[in-house]
Amino acid sequence: APKNNFGYVSIDDEKSRKIVELFEAVEDENIGFLKEIFSKDLKFTDPNGTELNKDEFIAGVENIFDMFDDVEFEDSEYSDYDGLAVETTYYTNGQVWTNIWSRFEGKGKYTGNEVSFPFHISYLWEGDKIIEEVQFFSTKVFDAENEAKNNQLK
């Protein structure tokens, strides 16, 4: 890839492929892959700016598994990968960030709603582990499903 003062972007490197695998693991509800790829020192920031540690993040993913069936990530016209547009930027300052643009699709177990919404997530790498995740999307779907779940559990 051509280099400049900024860095360079790759769509077919190891880290981009790992993020594709990460989303396949979410579709398969394979929490073990997530526990492995995320650093023990993970700093996770949700779309509302709330910061969580790794244990809190994993619990949140397990809650998504509980709230939704048939989770899939929609094909993107911008990508060679099925379902995902993923790119990794290798900055000249040494930071490596992988970004994904996709759609979350699934069926709410508590509302019965078929849901679909676009999202963007950025991942900062430290070696072969993800040390930071920052999410950008509307949480309305998750909030509604969580509310329905809590109401049913009362």
Model-derived regions: residue spans:
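A short gly/proline-enriched turn/hairpin at secondary-structure junctions
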Residues: N5, I37, D41-N53, M67
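Sec-exported extracytoplasmic/periplasmic mature domains
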Residues: E24-D28, S39-K43, E62-D70
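Short, low-complexity N-terminal intrinsically disordered segments enriched in polar/charged residues
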Residues: A1-G32, E36, L153-K154
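Surface-exposed, charged secondary-structure patches
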Residues: I58-T111
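Short, surface-exposed coil-to-beta transition loops
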Residues: E114-H120
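Short, solvent-exposed coil/turn segments at beta-strand boundaries
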Residues: Y123-I130
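Low-complexity, intrinsically disordered terminal/linker segments enriched in charged
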Residues: I131-K154
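A mature extracytoplasmic/lumenal domain signature
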Residues: F38, N48, S102-F104, I121, ...
